[in-house]
């Protein structure tokens, strides 16, 4: 028996008839997957929207010679806050993947349904695309002004599709002369591997040093740390952020914004890195004899006692009991 009574929101807060009717419709199994996908898209939107906005200030400020508009430090914080908002607002509905590599890892290691995984990944990429479109339109006047300034200076071709050009606000590019593809691969792989270890640790119910309420901050700090240390050599960390934003850059600037071979690194390397990190954590760091921390147990009980889940489980149990009580023909 739970140490505290199980009280659902509807027990203490009454909603209007319209909202109750809408909840009954949206929570049907045939429809609820769309709500989960909406939450995944919205979560990635938060992450990308705040990160790109800060990146736009950095890139445009440098082109227009306006100092103090942004910095790598600020960009790291912007992405970190976006992650906090994503987890805080959306994770209760979808589970809080917000990254295709996390969804793929959950599918392989934790039985996440493959069809649902495909839907999640599409939603994540869509969220990044929508965020890119909004950031572009909010910054459009200054982006166009920056492009004109680059053309007047005769450096448009050499700057536009680099981290220092307006297209670099959205799509990820190698810094010319500063990075090779093998080193970019190493940079991406190591950072994604470390980040995935942190995520897996935050999800470990025996991690008493990382209670559930702190997990969003730990994960956000890991993202920020990677950006602060390795954004300049070039880093992606999230396929949805990369693919969604690159598709938007292609929408605006055409094939020139594709990014060449480096785009494969930014879009794909985080997937094997995350899978390897999950294997390493499961093999070397998980200990089934450790005690489940009280805060994690409470979190697990809250998830398990979701009203619809409990009713479904009770219906299944009644069905099993009815089946077992019937005499089977010999």
From Swiss-Prot:
Pfam families: MIP. It comes from the Eukaryota. This is Aquaporin Lacbi1:307192. Residues 62-71, 146-157, 205-207, 286-330 are extracellular. Keywords: Membrane, Repeat, Transmembrane, Transmembrane helix, Transport. GO terms for molecular function: glycerol channel activity; water channel activity. Water channel-like protein that does not show transport of water nor ammonium across membranes. It is a multi-pass membrane protein. Induction: Expression is induced 2-fold during ectomycorrhiza formation. Residues 312-330 have a biased composition (Basic and acidic residues). GO terms for cellular component: plasma membrane. A motif (NPA 2) lies at residues 238-240. A motif (NPA 1) lies at residues 99-101. Signal peptide: none annotated. It is found in: Membrane. Belongs to the MIP/aquaporin (TC 1.A.8) family. It comes from Laccaria bicolor (strain S238N-H82 / ATCC MYA-4686) (Bicoloured deceiver). Aquaporins contain two tandem repeats each containing three membrane-spanning domains and a pore-forming loop with the signature motif Asn-Pro-Ala (NPA). Lacbi1:307192 has NPC/NSA motifs which is in accordance with the fungal aquaporins (NPx and NxA). Residues 308-330 are annotated as: Disordered.
């Amino acid at each position: 028996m739970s140490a505290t009574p199980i009280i659902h929101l509807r027990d203490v807060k009454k909603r209007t008839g319209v909202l109750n009717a809408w909840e009954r419709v949206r929570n049907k199994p045939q429809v609820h997957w769309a709500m989960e996908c909406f939450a995944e898209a919205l979560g990635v939107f938060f992450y990308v929207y705040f990160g790109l906005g800060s990146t736009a200030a950095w890139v445009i400020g440098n082109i227009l010679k306006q100092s103090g508009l942004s910095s790598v430090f600020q960009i790291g914080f912007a992405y970190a806050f976006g992650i906090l908002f994503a987890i805080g607002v959306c994770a209760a509905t979808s589970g809080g993947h917000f990254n295709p590599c996390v969804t793929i890892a959950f599918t392989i290691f934790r039985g996440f349904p493959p069809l649902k995984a495909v839907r999640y990944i599409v939603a994540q990429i869509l969220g990044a695309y929508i965020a890119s479109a909004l950031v572009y339109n909010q910054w459009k006047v200054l982006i166009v002004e920056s492009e004109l300034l680059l053309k007047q200076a005769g450096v448009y071709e050499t700057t536009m599709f680099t981290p220092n050009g307006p297209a670099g606000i959205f799509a990820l590019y190698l810094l010319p002369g500063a990075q090779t593809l093998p080193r970019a691969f190493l940079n991406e792989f190591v950072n994604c591997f470390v980040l995935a270890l942190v995520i897996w640790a935050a999800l470990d119910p025996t991690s008493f040093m990382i209670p559930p309420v702190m997990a969003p901050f730990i994960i956000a700090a890991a993202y920020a740390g990677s950006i602060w240390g390795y954004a300049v050599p070039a880093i992606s960390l999230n396929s949805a952020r990369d693919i969604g934003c690159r598709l938007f850059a292609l929408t605006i600037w055409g094939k020139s914004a594709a990014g060449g071979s480096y785009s494969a690194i930014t879009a794909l390397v985080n997937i094997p890195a995350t899978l390897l990190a999950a294997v390493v954590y499961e093999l070397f760091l998980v200990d089934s004899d450790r005690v489940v921390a009280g805060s994690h147990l409470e979190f697990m009980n809250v998830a398990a006692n979701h009203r619809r889940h409990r009713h479904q489980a009770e219906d299944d149990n009644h069905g099993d009991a009815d089946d077992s009580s019937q005499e089977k023909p010999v």
